[in-house]
């Protein structure tokens, strides 16, 4: 149950009954401090101002008709017109029982939508680097959350698998094959081939002519070029899948929807834009002028959709992409997890999409932008030599550091256990460090903070789960077969249950806003509430059997909630650390 939504609806009804205009926002929020209740309705003051009446007097009118029977034990007016709402212990205990009996922990399914999520998008013939991390793991966390809420989600890995670079790669691979025979098709080799191909393309005109010819042949469906292109894609995606699997990311080869997929749509789209009077010729190119965007002279900005040589641009592909996702995938929402530097480019493409009538306004096109991952020096994260950090190298280093940390913390574990724990902690640490930050901000990547067992980190959250689970393993009890009823005998119990009952609010916020850090913040607060409860409220050594059983239920619900929350982030838990 989403308690915030429940109360918001009740307050909205009361506002209207008290004379507020229909649709006036109740603005119900979780209270920042316990002294202000569990929830606070902040919408009264805005309505009172519009009505020209005293806010506190209007708040009283709202309270007079507010029906929170069976939900709140107390309501009060505070400050200039806030309404503080204190949840009843009986209501909370009942909700906790229901959540514990439900494998979904009380989280309701939403009305199903078709949602397309565009994320990760590495380039073919290049290894994934740290710049791909954010899109990959943020997108995957949101996708997992949307699926948990019952939505039909199509993962779209929009890989860079088309363009002039394939002409020079194919030409160079053919040259080397003629000299040396079959070429080893490892991605690390292709990285070297790529650099060599670029050098040849820039310095050898004969090679450049051949490469450009192969681009034309590839676009025309030439069998040799198509076969070589497919090999490049296959080798790249095999390597990328290793990274996805290590990171517990749910993308597979079946989710690849690369740039090449839209090739056949580009010319018809440009022709259609011309027919609709949107695309016009300018210096031999086809350009769409947008009044919504101005150049430095204040004139409508021109967006090129076809170059004078007949070639198409990323914008054209993105127009086709949005069109396809609505027409063929029946999308209700399309989410793009692409860095913030691409924002204007996407907005321009979508403006054209709307003007052309390819995607109606009822379909939400959303750019979930993100900031950069920075080194300790505040600059883009690089190797010591100043090069790009390969994602696989970052994950290797995370595992090495985690093994050293675990050997220091727990020398009694077997070598096999240490390796398993190190891998799980390492991948979780890299992911959680990123996911716990607000998506739109840049953040500093610092190994010491990432692997710390204190603060809002993966090791802390994994240990928090292990700590709760150990209560049951020590007592040889199952979390799924607990007797008795939940009862509240201490303020710490009430605070813990209140936080547990806000899980659905966190889940829905991640799904609607595309902000995984909201789940991280929730789980960190939940772990803190459990620590306070655990210190103040004895569990296994409690003399009152009914209180002992009740507290075991709260511990079980806490463990299950942390485990489920971390799972939505793509992070595994451990029974022992």
UniProtKB/Swiss-Prot annotation:
Under InterPro entries, the record lists: aa-tRNA-synth_I_CS, Arg-tRNA-ligase, Arg-tRNA-synth_N, Arg-tRNA-synth_N_sf, ArgRS_core, DALR_anticod-bd, Rossmann-like_a/b/a_fold, tRNAsynth_Ia_anticodon-bd
- The question of whether Ligase is a record keyword is answered with yes
Which protein family is it in? Belongs to the class-I aminoacyl-tRNA synthetase family.
Q: A Gene Ontology molecular-function term?
A: ATP binding
Q: Where in the cell is it found?
A: Cytoplasm
Q: Which domain of life is it from?
A: Bacteria
Q: What is its EC number?
A: 6.1.1.19
- Motif stretch ('HIGH' region): 122-132
- Quickly give the catalysed reaction: tRNA(Arg) + L-arginine + ATP = L-arginyl-tRNA(Arg) + AMP + diphosphate
The top EC class, named as a word, is ligase
Query: What does the subunit comment say?
Result: Monomer.
For the biological process aspect of GO, one term held by this record is:
arginyl-tRNA aminoacylation
Keyword annotations for this protein, in alphabetical order, are:
Aminoacyl-tRNA synthetase, ATP-binding, Cytoplasm, Ligase, Nucleotide-binding, Protein biosynthesis
GO-annotated cellular components = cytoplasm
Major location, coarse class? Answer: cytoplasm
- What name goes with this protein? Arginine--tRNA ligase
CDD domains on file: Anticodon_Ia_Arg, ArgRS_core
**Any matching Pfam family:** Arg_tRNA_synt_N
Where is the organism placed in the taxonomic lineage, from the top?
Answer: Bacteria, Pseudomonadati, Pseudomonadota, Gammaproteobacteria, Vibrionales
């Amino acid at each position: 149950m989403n308690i915030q939504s429940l109360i918001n609806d009740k307050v909205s009804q009361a506002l209207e009954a008290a004379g507020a205009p229909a649709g006036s926002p109740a603005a119900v929020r979780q209270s920042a401090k316990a002294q202000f209740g569990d929830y606070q309705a902040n919408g009264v003051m805005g309505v009172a101002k519009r009505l020209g009446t005293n806010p506190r007097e209007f708040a009283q009118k709202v309270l007079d008709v507010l029906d929170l029977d069976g939900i709140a034990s107390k309501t009060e007016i505070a400050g200039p017109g806030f309404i503080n709402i204190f949840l009843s212990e009986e209501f909370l205990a009942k909700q906790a029982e229901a959540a514990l009996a439900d494998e979904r922990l009380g989280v309701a399914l939403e009305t199903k939508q078709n949602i397309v999520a565009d994320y990760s998008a590495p380039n073919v013939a290049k290894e994934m680097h740290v710049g791909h991390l954010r899109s990959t793991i943020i997108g995957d966390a949101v996708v997992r959350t949307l699926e948990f809420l019952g939505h039909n989600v199509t993962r779209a890995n929009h890989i860079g698998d088309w363009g002039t670079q394939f002409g020079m790669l194919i030409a160079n691979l053919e040259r080397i094959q003629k000299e040396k025979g079959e070429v080893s098709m490892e991605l690390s080799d292709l990285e070297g081939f790529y650099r060599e191909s670029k050098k040849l393309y820039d310095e050898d005109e004969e090679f450049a002519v051949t490469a450009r010819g192969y681009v034309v042949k590839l676009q025309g469906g030439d069998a040799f070029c198509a076969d070589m292109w497919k090999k490049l894609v296959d080798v790249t995606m095999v390597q990328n899948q290793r990274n996805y699997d290590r990171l517990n990311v749910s993308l597979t080869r079946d989710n690849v929807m690369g740039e090449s997929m839209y090739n056949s749509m580009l010319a018809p789209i440009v022709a259609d834009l011309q027919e609709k009077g949107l695309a016009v010729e300018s210096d031999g190119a086809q350009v769409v002028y947008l009044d919504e965007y101005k150049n430095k002279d204040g004139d409508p900005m021109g967006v090129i959709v076809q170059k004078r040589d007949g070639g198409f641009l990323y914008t054209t592909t993105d127009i086709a992409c949005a069109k396809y996702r609505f027409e063929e995938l029946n999308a209700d929402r399309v989410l793009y997890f692409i860095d913030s530097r691409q924002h204007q480019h996407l907005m321009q493409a979508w403006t054209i999409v709307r003007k052309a009538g390819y995607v109606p306004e009822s379909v939400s096109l959303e750019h979930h932008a993100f900031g950069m991952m920075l080194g300790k020096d505040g600059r883009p994260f690089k190797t010591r030599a100043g090069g790009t950090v390969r994602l696989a190298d970052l994950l290797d280093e995370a595992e090495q550091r985690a093994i050293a940390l675990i050997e220091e913390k727990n020398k009694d574990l077997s070598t096999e256990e240490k390796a398993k724990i190190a891998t799980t902690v390492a991948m979780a640490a890299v992911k959680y460090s990123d996911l716990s930050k607000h998506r739109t901000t840049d953040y500093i990547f610092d190994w010491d903070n990432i692997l710390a067992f204190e603060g809002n980190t993966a090791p802390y959250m994994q240990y928090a789960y292990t700590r709760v689970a150990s209560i049951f393993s020590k007592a040889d009890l199952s979390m799924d077969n607990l007797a008795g009823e939940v009862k509240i005998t201490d303020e710490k119990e009430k605070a813990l249950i209140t936080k547990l009952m806000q899980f659905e609010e966190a889940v829905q916020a991640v799904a609607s806003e595309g902000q995984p850090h909201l789940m991280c913040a929730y789980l960190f607060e939940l772990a803190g509430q459990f620590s306070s409860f655990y210190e103040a409220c004895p569990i296994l050594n409690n003399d009152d059997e009914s209180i002992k059983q009740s507290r075991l239920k709260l511990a079980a619900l806490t463990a299950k909630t942390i485990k489920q929350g971390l799972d939505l982030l793509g992070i595994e838990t451990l029974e022992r650390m």
